[in-house]
């Protein structure tokens, strides 16, 4: 199966709902909402890190496989938006059913992240790029994606420090650090 725009977007919907089916029908428990929240964030991160890293990996490695993935970079971003919108619904459900409250930092920091994500989503067409101008579009998308990656980095680094060094969070943090290093090196050379 070829990686197409439709396949990417459909996968974000399919995997988001597959998580719900798994946690609530296949292996239901008192922790289902918490686990669904956690794993929907993991799913979102995979789409985000792909969208974030493809251009620098294409420039650095120039491999056919990466070049082919980079063609659909916009759709990795839109798939992130879909899966992270499901994550937002899951978070609301979790806080509603658990009677826990999110912290003010999570509300403000996460809220800003969602605003930026939706602004990027709404401007992810060629027509919108023309309408708002390439320079404005580039500023919005550069600030937006970097902010989102920083939020994930902060969250994962905190989970890594609070848990085991041998966790998936360590892999995520290292992946972000590697991509940042490649971007800094490219910037320094230009």
Put a short name on every predicted segment.
Residues 1-190:
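Membrane-embedded alpha-helical bundles that constitute the cytochrome b-like, heme-associated redox core
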């Amino acid at each position: 199966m070829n990686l197409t725009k439709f396949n990417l977007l459909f996968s974000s919907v399919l995997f988001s709902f597959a998580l719900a089916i798994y946690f609530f029908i296949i292996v239901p428990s008192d922790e289902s909402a918490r686990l669904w929240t956690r794993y929907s964030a993991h799913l979102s991160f995979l789409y985000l890190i792909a969208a974030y890293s493809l251009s620098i990996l294409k420039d650095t490695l120039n491999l056919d496989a990466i070049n082919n993935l980079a063609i659909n970079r916009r759709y990795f971003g839109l798939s992130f938006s879909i899966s992270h919108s499901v994550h937002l619904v899951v978070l609301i459900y979790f806080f509603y059913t658990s009677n826990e409250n999110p912290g003010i930092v999570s509300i403000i920091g996460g809220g800003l992240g969602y605003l930026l994500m939706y602004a990027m989503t709404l401007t992810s067409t060629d027509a919108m790029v023309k309408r708002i101008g390439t320079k404005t579009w580039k500023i919005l998308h550069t600030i937006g994606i970097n902010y989102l990656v920083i939020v994930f980095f902060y969250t994962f680094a905190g989970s890594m420090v609070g848990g085991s060094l041998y966790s998936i969070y360590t892999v995520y943090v290292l992946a972000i650090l590697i991509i940042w290093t490649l971007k800094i090196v490219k910037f320094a050379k230009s």
